[in-house]
Every structure is written in structure tokens, then in C-alpha cells.
Amino acid sequence: MTRLLMLLVRFYQRYLSPLKGGPTCRFTPSCSQYAYEALAKYGAIKGTWLAVRRVLRCHPFHPGGYDPVP
């Protein structure tokens, strides 16, 4: 399951994200890279939870910045 989720993130990074016309994430690493790293480090359940929390923080009213996977 983890590998499938990681493949979906890579698909998004490679084929869908470029359609947005440039970087739009407020964080470093980007939200999709954060999701990929969280899945690789923690597995499907905790990695998905961390990724969802991160995406919910990525909005115009949050300052963003450096936020690595714990």
C-alpha cells in the first residue's frame, strides 16, 4: 500500500504539478515531496496522516517556510 501511495505522489509530481505553471507551495520541501518522504519514513497510515496535516497548513494565511518530515 505504501508503495502505491508513493507512486501516486510521483505521478502527481511528474505529470500534474507542472500544469500549475510553477511552484505554488509555501513550504520547503514542497507538500508533495513532504508526502513522499513521510510515506517512505513512516508507512501508509502515519505517512498519509502527516501529509494530510501538512497540506491543510498550506494556505495563503500561513507563512510557510522550512518544515521537514519529523
From Swiss-Prot:
Q: Where in the cell is it found?
A: Cell membrane
Coiled coil feature spans = none
Q: Recite the UniProt keywords alphabetically.
A: Cell membrane, Membrane
What domain of life?
Bacteria
Task: Identify the species of origin.
Answer: Symbiobacterium thermophilum (strain DSM 24528 / JCM 14929 / IAM 14863 / T)
Q: What does this protein do?
A: Could be involved in insertion of integral membrane proteins into the membrane.
Organism lineage reads as: Bacteria, Bacillati, Bacillota, Clostridia, Eubacteriales
Q: How does it sit in the membrane?
A: Peripheral membrane protein
Q: Name one GO cellular component term.
A: plasma membrane
Name where it mostly resides. membrane
This protein is called what? Putative membrane protein insertion efficiency factor
Q: Which NCBIfam families match?
A: membrane protein insertion efficiency factor YidD (TIGR00278)
Q: Does the keyword DNA repair apply?
A: no
What is the similarity comment for this entry?
Belongs to the UPF0161 family.
